[in-house]
A protein has these predicted regions:
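Short amphipathic alpha-helical surface micro-motifs
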Residues: 25-26, 61-62, 82
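Short, well-structured alpha-helical interface segments that form or flank functional binding sites
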Residues: 28, 40, 74-77, 163
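N-terminal export/targeting leaders of redox proteins
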Residues: 2-34, 54, 65-70, 87-178
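N-terminal, post-signal-peptide region of Sec/Tat-exported proteins
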Residues: 43-75
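The canonical Cys-X-X-Cys-His
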Residues: 38-49, 76-86
Length: 178
């Protein structure tokens, strides 16, 4: 009986550690990245639906367009019918090169911080990008950059792009901890 009694503090400590680890699972390095990637500028196109969303309230696209087989809309209503390489019509119609929905494999809608972190590093879900490719994509891609220049009446992600890239670099250089 004595060995069990001596083991109780260790058992209790391990159990407590297990309880705490799930609540502390999110890496502090990933927290600001999650905050940006779950902002409407990102989630409206990284949606888990068969249609794009728009606005900060993330309503269904006004023209009722659908994803289409190639994520560029249905054959009779492609994204490029309205969305050009830059914002047009007094910034009412947003635009950037290769305007399209992210593939469903890149849907972030509804993911927890842990799930999104894991998905970002999953080559089958992220466009076959390693962490450095992901950093380059989020630093240089014109469609990503549009999120920080969305035109009037559209909010921007919570960090300036330069700061986001700095924070993303810290996360990448640390090995992408979740």
């Amino acid at each position: 009986m004595k060995p069990l009694r001596q083991s109780l503090p260790l058992i209790f400590g391990l159990a407590l550690l297990g309880l705490c680890s799930s609540s502390l699972a999110q890496s502090p390095l990933f927290a600001p990245i999650y905050e940006v990637l779950t902002h409407p500028r990102c989630l409206n196109c990284h949606t888990a639906t068969d249609f794009p969303r728009q606005g900060d309230e993330r309503r269904r696209h006004d023209q009722l367009v659908v994803r289409g087989d190639d994520n560029h809309g249905a054959p009779t209503l492609q994204c490029s019918a309205c969305h050009q390489d830059r914002n047009v019509a007094d910034d009412e119609v947003p635009g950037a090169p290769h305007w399209a929905l992210a593939p469903l494999s890149m849907a972030w809608e509804g993911l927890s911080p842990q799930e999104l972190c894991v998905a970002l590093k999953d080559l089958d879900k992220n466009g076959n990008r390693d962490l450095n490719d992901l950093l380059h994509h989020m630093s240089e891609d014109a469609l990503v950059l549009w999120g920080w220049s969305p035109g009037k009446n559209r909010s921007r992600p919570p960090y300036e792009h330069e700061e986001f890239v700095r924070l993303l670099s810290l996360w990448v250089n640390a090995g992408g901890p979740c």
